[in-house]
Amino acid sequence: AEDLFKCDVFVFVASKGIPPVGSGVKDVRMYQFENNSKIVAQYARQARKENFKGLFAVVSDPVDPLAKTAWLESNKDDSGVLDYQGLRPEQVHGFGLGVMNARAAYFAKRDERFKRFLTEGRSFGPHGQDLVVADSITDYNDELSKELTELTVTANLHMRAIGFKPFIAPAYSSGAISLVLMMRGEWHCGSVFLGGIYMGVKNRYTAFGLETE
């Protein structure tokens, strides 16, 4: 444990679990946040204690609130007072948007109406209900974008409804693939600190710092 932060990238994937299918829990992400925020806070405080200078990557759900929790908790002293002596905002990065972008691409490949998304589209926001999918950033169509957003947001609910927990797709699209792209300095989908919150956008790390599209 003492060597945990002797690295360039720390990836937080711990989770206390999710409600079983059919449990009746309506807000799964709030349930996850209540449990996982306590765990991420513990590691964020350890990162502060060890003066960690690398990247603190959050993959566990709900990504965006957990990323902010990690940043805030690392910046509190032993009395719980914010002193901003911990992780810098750009050191914390959330990885949850990748799978939403991939789900939007899945529907775009199956429906001609959405095909522009594959070359002109973008996904913004959190890994959850407040996601915004734009069918095109050059010739935006509000009606099509809202329909594609709805399909994307509810895709995991359909998986749960037929008895599966949708974890493989996020592990690949939001986790493994996006992490590799980030470490290569390539464009990828992820949550970065914008205006006081962690917001999912297309971004990359450069020699001059974080760049958002």
Language model features: what each stretch is:
Residues A1, Y43-N51, A70-N75, A176-M183:
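Hydrophobic, Leu/Ile/Phe/Ala-enriched alpha-helical segments that form helix-helix packing faces
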Residues E2-L55:
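Rossmann-like NAD(P)-binding element
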Residues V11, I18, S74, V180-W187:
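Structural signal for hydrophobic packing residues in well-ordered secondary-structure cores
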Residues V13, V58-V59, L194:
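Short beta-strand segments
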Residues M30, F56, S60, G163-P166:
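Short, charged/polar micro-motifs that form catalytic or ligand-binding hotspots
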Residues N35-K38, Q42, P65, A171-S178:
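Conserved active-site and cofactor/substrate-binding residues in soluble primary-metabolism enzymes
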Residues L55-D139:
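Rossmann-like dinucleotide-binding core of oxidoreductases
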Residues M100, A108-E213:
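Long, compositionally biased stretches enriched for glycine and/or charged residues
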